[in-house]
Amino acid sequence: IDRKIYTYKFRKACENADKIIAISECTKRDIIRYFNIPDDKIEVVYQGCDVSFTHPVTEEKKEEVRKKYQLPDHYILNVGSIEERKNILAAVQALPMLPQHIHIVIVGRRTGYTEKVEQFIKDNGLGERVHIISNVPFNDLPAFYQLAEIFVYPSRFEGFGIPIIEALYSGTPVVAATGSCLEEAGGPDSIYVNPDDITGLAGAF
């Protein structure tokens, strides 16, 4: 019922609006497809990220964050709520194909899906190589990005993908999923893989 009410309200808002701002071309296409809104009524305005990600983090701050969270020397980073559509399990499934010294650090809010990820970690003996960290203060996040070797975002669906922008501003290479808007966020210099292609994801790393 909630979904039907939300859909009705969204449709009415789109119909009554003089102009609609979409956060990506992908979102614009969805609005046109699902709500039959004219193309010329919608403008795309991409999102940015907080300015703190555009500045180098001091070595002192990096060392403080590394010690505080016991971060490994070489890790692939993911930032975002740990939920099914964000598909972080795919990156964890790729980890056994990578050298032993490579770890994955997942920063985000836990959901029921986290248990599925943790079960795979347990079943495959990856407990020493996967680090799930929640409740990280915002001012520590830039150091997480700048200490990482790679940022991974294998999400199946996003409206835009701000963490990709944060990673790019941090100078961290991005591997993301095809199929939604992430190629818009990451641009031509990131690597994109089918979110179901675990071997391809490992190869991209």
Model-derived regions: residue spans:
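Carbohydrate transferase catalytic cores enriched for Leloir-type hexosyltransferases
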Residues: 1-205
